[in-house]
Amino acid sequence: MSENYIQMIGQDKIYPIIRCKEASQTIEIAKALVEGGIRVLEINVENPSIYEAIQEVSKFANVCAGGIITSMQADAALECGAKLFSSPIFQMNMVKISKNKQVPFIAGASTANEAYNAW
């Protein structure tokens, strides 16, 4: 992990999450965010076409693939160039993927039990 993406997010004080159904719209929004100085942005994986956007945007930005809940999604996003990934829920298998591939993972928690297990 040569870059500290989590530190960049903290320094930028903003973490944009792009949720679009169309890859082209996602790419245009990402370009505008980067032109505005954003260093890390999240692209939520709404559907399979969004991997195309991750692949394109990762050429000019640090992309976090968001909404990842399966190992197949994580692998696909990382293969497309995502530098980190996030999930709306806590799953230990996502932590294992993060450690094995040496990429940051931002875990969400929807319940007290999920938060406790993540701790």
Model-derived features with residue positions:
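Conserved anion-binding
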Residues: 49, 69-73, 78-119
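Conserved N-terminal beta1-alpha1 strand-loop-helix module at the mouth
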Residues: 1-81, 100
